[in-house]
Regions:
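Bacterial N-terminal signal peptides that target proteins for export
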Residues: 2-14
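Bacterial N-terminal signal peptides
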Residues: 14-24
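Acidic, glycine/proline-rich low-complexity segments that act as flexible tails and inter-domain linkers
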Residues: 28-91, 144-226, 256, 273, ...
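Extended intrinsically disordered, low-complexity coil regions enriched in Ser, Thr, Gly, Ala
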Residues: 90, 106-129, 133, 143-155, ...
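Aromatic- and histidine-enriched alpha-helix N-cap/loop-to-helix transition segments
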Residues: 91-95, 126, 227, 262, ...
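Short, structured motif recognition centered on aromatic/hydrophobic residues
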Residues: 93-102, 131-132, 228-238, 247, ...
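A short structural micro-motif
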Residues: 103, 121, 134-141, 238, ...
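Long compositionally biased, domain-poor regions of proteins
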Residues: 210-216, 220, 233-234, 241-248, ...
Length: 277
């Protein structure tokens, strides 16, 4: 590409950060936080990584250390020695974000241990299932089902009864109405304008199915609050790449439900090791 041409920012994390920083939304900012333990300022990245891995997984060893020790060191010290200690998001939110990012990108080799880690740091089986269900409108059912099968394997190993309690709140009669209600609570009057401007031959997609399925069937469910669902959605679509328009919309949506600029930057920080820059 000639040097004078404008660069097309299409990579997931950079694109999401670009959309976030250039958003016209009045995003409340907060001071960055670091979750380093007492005395932790004197701890090395290696020590911090080991401490965090023991908390999440019960051990700090990876088979990769036997074949690619330098790579394992780079990975573990970034994820567990830096990222896991950074920011405003608690361990449960970090693990839920990790699960949806791995699901969206279909990098499932290391997925199951993070299901266990999510349970270890306090996520309920219902919260984990709801985080998975939140992926479906954005990545489709087959990819979501692949991750769900792994979740279910972990639950069986831990003797967690299946199915978990239903979190459904809508009926066939009110799923569209309740979906529109949730949409408006996130995006405001823009929803009415979108419904009015949608061409007749696209209304079944951009009005009926979007409102009834994505927001009615999924967003109205119990188990996760609206702020959590929006920040997970932001991470899911950021992981996909090439979704700048949707990312911008959900930056505004996150603001509208009470998430801060720092929350979103911290969420992207959590995504970084799994989707790259």
């Amino acid at each position: 590409m000639p040097a004078h041409k404008k660069r097309n920012i299409s990579c997931g994390l950079f694109a999401a950060l670009f959309c976030l920083l250039l958003s016209g939304a009045a995003i409340a900012a907060s001071s960055p936080t670091q979750q380093v333990p007492n005395g932790g300022k004197n701890m090395s990245r290696a020590a911090l990584a080991e401490k965090k891995q023991l908390e999440r997984f019960g051990n700090a060893w990876s088979p990769l250390e036997a074949t690619d020790p330098d790579f394992a060191e780079m990975r573990d010290r970034l994820i567990w020695g830096e990222v896991a200690w950074h920011g405003s998001l608690d361990a449960k939110m970090q693990e839920l974000i990790t699960l949806v990012v791995l699901t969206a990108s279909q990098t499932l080799d290391g997925f199951a241990p993070h299901v266990g880690a999510a349970l270890q740091v306090g996520a309920t089986p219902e919260e984990i299932k709801e985080a998975m269900y939140q992926c479906a409108p954005y990545i489709g059912f087959p990819k979501t089902e692949k991750a769900l099968r792994l979740v279910n394997e972990v639950f069986r190993e831990k003797r967690i009864p299946l199915p978990v309690a239903s979190q459904k709140t809508v009926t066939e009669d009110d799923r569209f109405m309740q979906g529109v209600k949730v949409q408006k609570s996130i995006f405001g009057a823009a929803i009415d304008a979108m419904h009015k401007s949608t061409p007749q031959n696209q209304r079944h997609l951009l009005r009926d199915m979007l409102s009834a399925f994505c927001f009615g069937d999924v967003y109205t469910r119990k188990g996760l609050d609206l702020r959590t669902r929006e920040i997970l959605t932001f991470c899911i679509i950021s992981s996909l790449g090439g979704c700048e328009s949707q990312v911008k919309s959900h930056v505004q949506g996150n603001v509208n439900v009470g998430n801060t600029k720092e929350n979103l930057i911290d969420a992207l920080t959590c995504c970084l090791p799994y989707i790259g820059f």
